[in-house]
Design a protein with these regions (language model features):
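Conserved glycine-rich cofactor-binding loop
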Residues: 15-16
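Conserved glycine-rich Rossmann-like NAD(P)H-binding loop of the short-chain dehydrogenase/reductase
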Residues: 29-45
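The beta1-alpha1 cofactor-binding region of Rossmann-like NAD(H)/NADP(H)-dependent oxidoreductases
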Residues: 59-69, 101
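Residue(s) in the substrate-gating loop at a strand-loop-helix junction
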Residues: 139
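C-terminal helical subdomain
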Residues: 180, 199-244
Length: 248
């Protein structure tokens, strides 16, 4: 496992779920963590549960100024950025023909473009340092079509994996690494707040016992930060699903 004591980490989508668990995990290992998300009250709850110093930055990642604020406040506080965790994202459930153009744009703005543009804002800091890690939260849905009625979500997460691969090629030899974590279904509030949540509820309930906990996913990611593979599976479940369905 990578030594994290004193490392400066930005975690987006840190107000709940995998993001909150990652923030706590990094802090437990001695990292200095910037917590970024829209819900300031929830960020402060997470901050109180962290063991080391944290910085709370309420931010809407779709706003360029908010992305710049995350970078500026982090470097002003700690002088560097060692790890960027692009975790913020959304789900979407519904028949393809009923998924509007606006919905497609929304999920790509949230799951891909906010990640791309925050990475662009952070990379100059890492390039000056000559080292860093960009950790992108994708999904098993970024590798296979893991369910029905999630075409928009699957497309956006495939784009995240593709972005990660392309970025890794561009950054080869710079000292900056890229990882794409691909968890399976995780027991978080993610599903409750996704468009189509009501229709998706029976499916979520059906697979509840098969879901990973956000704590297990976060720990699995932390354990693989030094992986020489670009795509990492936080737990055994997504790896098994991928092997079973990869040719479908």
């Amino acid at each position: 496992m990578v030594a994290l004591n004193g490392k400066v980490v930005i975690v987006t989508g840190a107000s709940s779920g995998i993001g909150a668990s990652l923030a706590r995990g990094f802090s437990r290992e001695g990292a200095l963590v910037t917590l970024a998300a829209r819900r300031e009250d929830r960020l402060r709850e997470v901050a109180r549960s962290c063991l080391h110093e944290v910085l709370v930055v309420p931010a809407d990642l779709l706003r360029p100024q908010d992305r710049e604020t995350i970078v500026q406040e982090t470097t002003a506080r700690w002088g560097r950025i060692d790890i960027l965790v692009n975790n913020a994202g959304m789900g979407m459930y519904g028949p393809f023909l009923q998924t509007t153009e606006a919905a497609w744009r929304q999920i790509f703005e949230t799951n891909l473009f906010s990640m791309v543009f925050l990475t662009q804002a952070v990379l100059p800091v890492m390039q000056t340092q000559g080292e860093g890690l960009v950790l992108n939260l994708a999904s098993i849905g970024g590798l296979i079509a893991h369910a029905e009625k999630v075409a928009a979500y699957v497309a956006s997460k495939h784009a995240v994996v593709g972005f990660s691969r392309g970025l890794a090629r561009d950054l080869a030899g710079t000292g900056i690494r890229v990882l794409a974590a691909c968890p399976h279904l995780t027991a978080t509030e993610f599903f409750r707040f996704s468009p189509g949540a009501e229709e998706m509820a029976p499916t979520v309930e059906k697979f509840k016992s098969f879901m990973d906990s956000p704590e297990d996913v976060a720990q699995g990611i932390l354990n693989q930060l030094d992986s020489d593979r670009l795509v990492v599976f936080p737990t055994a479940k997504p790896a098994k699903v991928f092997e079973k369905q990869r040719d479908i």
